[in-house]
């Protein structure tokens, strides 16, 4: 049985069930769950499916479930296609997802009669709309669960002032425009509650929006990114109260003071239940979870069901239905074990399957054909002017407030742009406005287009004004070569697990720190950000000094719940420092960040501490057919490459093959070892330097020179020269000669040091000379990575190199086919910054960087 939609009364189509005025009004099969007394209850004819029904004239599109499956495929396909098409323009996911949703709406394909009739009939729209709303609620819950509410109290005072100014000024300006143009608005938008809702929506920037866009732009771990998230979080906390006030105003418009009273009573009861019952339940779940494990699956299912229950309760109490999942998420202890388990178990399904239906729901209500001249003039111009004023005042107030608090101009402009980003939370607010009849579908369309345009324009501008890696390049020498002899040398040691740490400690002891030439080590443990929205960088020494303060105790809580693997690394750091405190000072850190952003913590630490080099373990690739216990984290592969590209100092990559036994670790329990230096066990270790010329090899030779003072090390330096000086750079040759001469004069009387020269014509002869060296006699191979090497010496070898982290020679001696079992150390010297820069404020503009797509995938 079928029913016809009334053509002239579109108000009967409830928006939250997915029946949009832009959809075709042709006959269609519908469910009887349409709550309107003006529409008769009808029955749907049930079809019995038959085997091979398509060959008997049966149409699968007559079934709601079959139609829903086709719709799911179309929605996800459109969004992915738009995402790929917009990637070269550096657009975040939210822009492509909204446009993909609009493609199936009346603005594009939804305006085609047959497209709606066969693929998006009303009954299937009803299913899609409800799934889309569920996607919204779970997205808000997950984002809130990653939010560190405790960071609000620890936020710097200037963040609070900037957040307040960036909200108050737009409220005053947008509110003034709204009141001045009130006579030009339709009767629904003229209400004080409606104008107030629009004003607050344009004045606040949602934390979930900032988090998702900055995550897509790889700016979560940047200074401005952290600044923006802190300011947005402060605004969101005020926004929680604004939502309650706004809902109370809408109840006052309908039911007066009596309705407002019972609404507030319901809010208090719901909030008390969440704080007194739900929060304690979460704490109990955490206490029942063994350290280092995921939360029990049954608890996760109960929490995800609780999201739906919170939606039901807030809707029943008259609150915005989104308040429930947000409040519930804020009560979840962020980070491991509960927050991280929720993210691992549900994030992919929510983001990649449920959320596309959310954007389809948004797109179905967006109809650009509503923007006609008379509609624009009579209804939409006040709303449009309010959005423009909101953007301008939000940008100017935030930027000038940041400048007042001595934030650099470039960062202030970037912060002002970030505070204008719009996204998922705003879309849900617009849908809520339709439900409350604050705006009609023309006004809703204006706000959705405002979200798309502002975010699409703002994100490239942010990239244009702000490059987080720009400060890492220093114009000062920060190298091993330029660190004076017999002075303290600083280095950053970056590790991700206990296995790689033992090899790096072995190397540090062979670097032979002494009282006269000590090492200052800044050891940072890299931990993947899980169950948290904001990156966390912990200085363990500072924590000890401030452990009596309450906020430090709160910050320590998520770390107590980390796996035992993290405790092992920190314990190893402490043990190493205790046994070598006369010649080594060590300060330990833990960096929680997304894997693709870990390099920023490493580079910022090296820059701030003015270290000579960064020491990294070589990250092996994962083998597809290997057992899970044998696999090394594939996400760490990009960390070394990013550090090599953006480093503010020299970099050493250590490939531990296990040949160098960690004698020092075994001797660490021996309290009678020398205090002047770290003596190895009485065994001689043979190191070799493959010197091919260039800055990187000069840096490697200076590091090897420090090792040569170790009485347990014999060092061989082999310099490769091209036949007839072919392909040599005169400047590099002179610099190489100077360093080699200095090294030989310094070590001429050292019987444990030898020097040789080999003349080769091409890469084949270079490789043959290396293989003829009794390669299995050497415990450590040291070489430069690539800079300044005579290309003639490597001719023919570059095509066989597979790993650019190690360079051509490093990759050759590290390969499994190479006969040596010795470990490999590859050195890259600092590339100093040439003064100047790119961007508008420097008078230069790199269009390639501006238009090139982001290299990472959106996770």
From Swiss-Prot:
The keyword Signal does not apply. Gene3D superfamilies: 1.20.1530.20. Specifically expressed in pollen. GO terms for cellular component: membrane. One of its GO terms (biological process) is proton transmembrane transport. Keywords: Antiport, Ion transport, Membrane, Phosphoprotein, Potassium, Potassium transport, Transmembrane, Transmembrane helix, Transport. It comes from the Eukaryota. Signal peptide: none annotated. The modification Phosphoserine is found at residue 857. Residues 546-557 have a biased composition (Acidic residues). Residues 538-566 are annotated as: Disordered. It is a multi-pass membrane protein. InterPro entries: Cation/H_exchanger_TM, CPA2_transporter, Na+/solute_symporter_sf. It is found in: Membrane. GO terms for molecular function: antiporter activity. Its main location: membrane. The keyword Transport applies. The chain crosses the membrane at residues 64-84, 92-112, 122-142, 161-181, 194-214, 227-247, 258-278, 291-311, 312-332, 348-368, 384-404, 438-458. May operate as a cation/H(+) antiporter. Belongs to the monovalent cation:proton antiporter 2 (CPA2) transporter (TC 2.A.37) family. CHX (TC 2.A.37.4) subfamily. This is Cation/H(+) antiporter 24.
């Amino acid at each position: 049985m079928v029913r016809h939609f009334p053509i002239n009364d579109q108000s009967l189509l409830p928006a939250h069930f997915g029946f949009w005025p832009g959809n075709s009004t042709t006959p269609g099969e519908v469910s009887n769950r349409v709550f309107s007394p003006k529409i008769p209850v009808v029955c749907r004819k049930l079809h019995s499916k038959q085997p091979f029904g398509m060959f008997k004239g049966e149409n699968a599109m007559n079934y709601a479930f079959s139609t829903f499956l086709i719709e799911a495929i179309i929605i996800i396909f459109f969004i992915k296609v738009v995402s790929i098409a917009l990637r070269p323009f550096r657009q975040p996911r939210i822009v492509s997802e909204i446009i993909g949703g609009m493609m199936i709406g009346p603005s594009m394909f939804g305006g085609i009669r047959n497209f709606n009739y066969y693929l998006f009939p009303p009954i299937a729209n009803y299913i899609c709309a409800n799934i889309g709303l569920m996607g919204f609620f779970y997205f808000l819950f997950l984002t809130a669960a990653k939010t560190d509410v405790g960071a609000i109290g620890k936020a710097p005072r200037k963040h609070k002032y900037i957040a307040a100014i960036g909200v108050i000024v737009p409220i005053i300006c947008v509110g003034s425009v709204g009141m001045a143009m009130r006579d030009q608005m339709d009767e629904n938008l003229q209400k004080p509650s409606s104008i107030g809702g629009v004003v607050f929506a344009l004045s606040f920037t949602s934390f979930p929006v900032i988090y998702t866009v900055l995550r897509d732009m790889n700016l979560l771990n940047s200074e401005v990114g952290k600044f923006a998230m802190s300011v947005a979080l402060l605004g969101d906390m005020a926004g929680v109260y604004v939502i309650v006030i706004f809902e109370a105003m809408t109840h006052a418009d309908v039911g007066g003071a009596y309705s407002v009273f019972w609404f507030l009573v319901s809010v208090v009861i719901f909030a008390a239940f969440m704080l007194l019952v739900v929060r304690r339940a979460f704490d109990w779940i955490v206490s029942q979870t063994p350290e280092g494990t995921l939360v029990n699956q049954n608890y996760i299912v109960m929490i995800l069901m609780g999201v739906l229950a919170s939606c039901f309760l807030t809707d029943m109490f008259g609150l915005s239905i989104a308040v429930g999942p947000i409040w519930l998420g804020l009560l979840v202890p962020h980070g491991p074990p509960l927050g991280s388990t929720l993210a691992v178990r549900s994030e992919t399904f929510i983001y990649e399957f449920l959320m596309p239906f959310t954007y389809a729901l948004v797109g179905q209500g967006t109809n650009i054909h509503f923007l006609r001249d008379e509609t624009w003039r009579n209804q939409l111009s006040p709303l449009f002017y309010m959005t423009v004023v909101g953007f301008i005042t939000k940008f100017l107030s935030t930027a000038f407030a940041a400048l007042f608090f001595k934030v650099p101009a470039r960062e202030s402009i970037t912060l002002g742009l970030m505070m204008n980003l719009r996204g998922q939370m705003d879309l849900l607010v617009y849908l809520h406005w339709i439900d409350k009849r604050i705006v009609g579908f023309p006004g809703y369309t204006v706000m959705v287009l405002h979200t798309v345009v502002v975010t699409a324009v703002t994100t490239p501008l942010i990239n244009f004004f702000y490059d987080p890696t720009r400060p890492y390049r220093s114009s000062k020498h920060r190298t091993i070569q330029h660190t004076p002899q017999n002075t303290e040398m600083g280095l950053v040691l970056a590790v991700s697990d206990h296995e790689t740490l033992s090899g790096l400690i072995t190397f540090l002891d062979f670097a032979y720190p002494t009282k006269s030439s000590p090492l200052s080590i800044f050891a940072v443990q890299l931990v993947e950000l899980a169950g948290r929205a904001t990156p966390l960088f912990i200085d363990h020494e500072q924590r000890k000094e401030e452990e009596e303060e309450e906020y430090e105790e709160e910050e320590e809580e998520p770390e107590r719940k980390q796996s035992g693997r993290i405790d092992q690394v920190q314990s190893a750091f402490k043990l190493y420092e205790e046994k070598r405190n006369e010649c080594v000072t060590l300060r330990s850190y833990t960096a929680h960040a997304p894997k693709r952003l870990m390099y920023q913590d490493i580079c910022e630490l090296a820059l701030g501490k003015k270290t000579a080099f960064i020491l990294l373990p070589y990250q092996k690739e994962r083998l597809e057919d290997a057992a899970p216990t044998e696999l090394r984290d594939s996400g760490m592969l990009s960390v070394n490459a990013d550090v090599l590209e953006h480093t503010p100092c020299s970099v050493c990559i250590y490939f531990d093959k296990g040949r160098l036994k960690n004698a020092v670790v075994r001797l660490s329990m021996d309290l009678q070892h020398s205090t002047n230096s770290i003596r190895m066990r009485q065994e001689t270790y043979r190191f070799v330097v493959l010197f091919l010329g260039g800055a990187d090899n000069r840096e490697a030779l200076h590091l090897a020179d420090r090792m040569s003072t170790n009485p347990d090390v014999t060092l061989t330096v082999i310099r490769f020269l091209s036949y007839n000086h072919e392909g040599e750079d005169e400047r590099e040759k002179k610099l190489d000669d100077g360093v080699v001469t200095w090294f030989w004069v310094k070590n001429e009387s050292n019987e444990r040091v030898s020097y040789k020269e080999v003349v080769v014509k091409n890469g084949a002869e270079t490789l043959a000379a290396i293989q003829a060296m009794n390669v299995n006699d050497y415990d450590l191979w040291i070489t430069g990575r690539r800079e300044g090497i005579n290309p003639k010496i490597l001719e023919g070898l570059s095509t066989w190199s597979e790993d650019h982290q190690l360079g051509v020679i490093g990759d050759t001696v590290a390969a499994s086919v190479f006969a040596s079992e010795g470990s490999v150390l590859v050195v890259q010297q600092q590339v100093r910054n040439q003064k100047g820069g790119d961007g508008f404020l420097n008078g230069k503009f790199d269009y390639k960087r501006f238009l090139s797509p982001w290299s990472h995938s959106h996770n």
